[in-house]
């Protein structure tokens, strides 16, 4: 009888261990520089995390840490996810200059269309052309924001010469080079530093899409806003939604399937649709805050495009010197954007 009880207890314990092994909860740590209320977190990252948990039956949980809560600075996010300090990140590719030399092509002036079309182009480009520079990561999505605009504290930019003498924040080295070519003094910094820099007079303005402005109260600190007319925006910025490769590979096949079903082209397209949708409400907030708004067109816009063309030419030359076919890369991006616009 005692032996039977011991055997029964052992079998029950064994079944318990098997059940735990198959139903084990895996926690994934997500890290980003943007604050929790920001649209990219509240309407993109959090819903994505909820889908992961729901579709895994609660076995995959995503702990979200925003505004660099786990330490470090925004340019360190890529290393944090590569090294396994965190499991997932969302960041700007250009915050680590030179790390993603092909992906940075998306930062060039007058290339982007809508965020939806350009995000799909960025995802295909990442999967086919920029594979080497992303080989250390599980790519969840590569996407962009809606075309960026020019914002200053009080000087409305209505022509190229209006940028002269202004200290303008650029998010990446490509966009900073564009601002410099257009006559401004470029100041590179991640977006969390923009509000204090405006308040302290370190910068006179910045280029960002409207969507990010409410998260950092930038619409309250700038009163002059300029956009460009036409099918191509002034610029955009490539975003990386990446997972630690070893962490992904350690998951069960079922858990990998959940991740795979919520990443790739469909996620990039969704991101683009969301970012396009974020722009309108944020613009309305800027309008309610008061100020001047202008859209460049005609000869004034042509002058900006002439400078933009030279920035592209210079980027191609630099890419060629680094062993890439710069012209082919730029043309590929243009073709991909057209593909997803049609």
Where are these regions (language model features)?
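N-terminal secretory/targeting leader peptides
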Residues: 24-116, 132-342
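Signature of the catalytic double-stranded beta-helix
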Residues: 120-128, 132
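Bacterial N-terminal signal peptides
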Residues: 8-17
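Bacterial N-terminal signal peptides that target proteins for export
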Residues: 1-8
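Sec/Tat signal peptide C-region and signal peptidase I cleavage site
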Residues: 17-23
């Amino acid at each position: 009888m005692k032996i039977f009880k011991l055997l029964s207890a052992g079998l029950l314990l064994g079944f318990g261990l098997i059940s735990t092994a198959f139903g084990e909860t895996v926690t994934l740590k997500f890290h980003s520089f943007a604050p929790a209320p920001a649209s990219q977190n509240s309407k993109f990252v959090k819903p994505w995390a909820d889908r992961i948990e729901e579709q895994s039956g609660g076995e995959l949980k995503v702990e979200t840490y925003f505004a660099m809560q786990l330490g470090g600075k925004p340019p360190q996010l890529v290393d944090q996810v590569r090294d396994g300090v965190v499991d997932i990140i969302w960041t700007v590719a250009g915050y680590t200059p030179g790390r993603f030399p092909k992906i940075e092509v998306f930062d060039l002036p007058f290339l982007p269309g809508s965020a939806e079309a350009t995000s799909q182009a960025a995802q295909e480009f990442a999967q086919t052309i920029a594979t080497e520079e992303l080989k250390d990561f599980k790519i969840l999505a590569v996407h962009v924001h809606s075309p960026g605009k020019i914002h200053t504290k009080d000087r409305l930019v209505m022509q190229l010469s209006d940028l002269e003498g202004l200290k303008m924040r650029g998010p990446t080295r490509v966009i900073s080079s564009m601002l410099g070519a257009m006559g401004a003094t470029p100041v590179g910094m991640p977006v969390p530093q923009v509000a204090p820099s405006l308040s302290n007079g370190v910068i006179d303005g910045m280029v960002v899409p409207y969507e990010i402005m409410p998260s950092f109260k930038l619409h309250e600190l700038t009163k002059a806003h300029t956009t460009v007319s036409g099918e191509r925006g002034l610029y955009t910025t490539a975003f990386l939604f990446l997972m630690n490769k070893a962490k992904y590979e350690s998951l069960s096949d079922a858990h990998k399937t959940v991740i795979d079903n919520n990443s790739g082209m469909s996620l990039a397209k969704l991101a683009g649709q969301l970012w396009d949708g974020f722009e309108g409400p944020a613009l309305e907030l800027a309008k309610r805050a008061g100020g001047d708004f202008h859209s460049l067109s005609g000869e004034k816009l042509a002058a900006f495009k002439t400078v933009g063309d030279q920035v592209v030419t210079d980027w191609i030359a630099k890419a060629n010197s680094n062993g890439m076919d710069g012209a082919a890369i730029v043309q590929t991006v243009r073709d991909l954007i057209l593909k997803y616009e049609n």
